[in-house]
Amino acid sequence: MKYKRIVFKVGTSSITRSDGSLSRGKIQTITRQLAALHRAGHELVLVSSGAVAAGFGALGFKKRPVKIADKQASAAVGQGLLMEEYTANLSSDGIVSAQILLSRADFADKRRYQNAGGALSVLLQRRAIPIINENDTVSVEELKIGDNDTLSAQVAAMIQADLLVLLTDIDDLYTGNPNSNPDAVRLDKIEHINHEIIKMAGGSGSANGTGGMLTKIKAATIAAESGVPVYICSSLKPDSLAEAAEHQADGSFFVPRAKGLRTQKQWLAFYSESRGSVYVDEGAEHALSEQGKAC
């Protein structure tokens, strides 16, 4: 098989209804395909959003909350509901699922990064399907990874995946917004992610999620630089996961760097925290604090 170890990422809108509640039908479509790929011998990881969206209704919120504490409480409820659906569906096919909640600190700290990678390796060797989400209940805003597109790319690089698939309700990458620009052309293959590609990606995603095409391009950069090819394709098609695994998906494919960064360089490039101090003399201090400019 071309791609044995695959990381799939599904966004909030791909597994919820328009009112933000979980769609069992959409989740069943995803788990059905995962089960088929698992039987075919693939090693699979699923990075799934949706905890906040699944939980806020159960707590009585009429719409997705904006306050941090409200979102964290919603995630605490919703993560359990989310895993309940995935576990029930996969166990009916005899597949063990494992919940892993990660935060930026798990990548920034080298020992925790190595421990997480080790646990994932064992789960894959034992034929389990890890289901990963950011630990929204305890992550503070300034220390969050921020979106699961980035998280999935970091996980794909960590475990040296053969493919990262970003599933979305946004139909691939175009040269412009196809909803407003009839001349927009879909990009089937991207050899190199440059400023023009980033500019094409535009802005935000759906009302229930945190990502958009721009976050997917940034995620594709992390994965491709680490030697992992990336597909961005629609989650609305019934066999989208299987098609991506066979390199037959109708989406945008990002070619990886020929020689991907090794684990140590990945950690230094993308995850380690930069720290330092800048010392200035009295003249520079005066210019910065009193005159508001650098000298």
Curated annotation (Swiss-Prot):
Protein name: Glutamate 5-kinase
Subcellular location: Cytoplasm
Family the entry assigns: Belongs to the glutamate 5-kinase family.
Task performed by this protein: Catalyzes the transfer of a phosphate group to glutamate to form L-glutamate 5-phosphate.
Residues that, per the record, bind ATP: K9, T168, D169, T210, G211, G212, M213, L214, T215, K216
A GO molecular function held by the record: glutamate 5-kinase activity
Keyword Nucleotide-binding: yes
Secretion signal span: none
BP terms from Gene Ontology: L-proline biosynthetic process
Organism: Neisseria gonorrhoeae (strain NCCP11945)
HAMAP family given in the database record: ProB
E.C. numbers: 2.7.2.11
Main localization category: cytoplasm
Protein keywords: Amino-acid biosynthesis, ATP-binding, Cytoplasm, Kinase, Nucleotide-binding, Proline biosynthesis, Transferase
UniProt gene name: proB
One term under GO cellular component: cytosol
Pathway: Amino-acid biosynthesis; L-proline biosynthesis; L-glutamate 5-semialdehyde from L-glutamate: step 1/2
Chain segments annotated as coiled-coil in the UniProt record: none
Residue sites binding substrate per the record: S49, D136, N148
SUPFAM superfamilies hit by this protein: Carbamate kinase-like
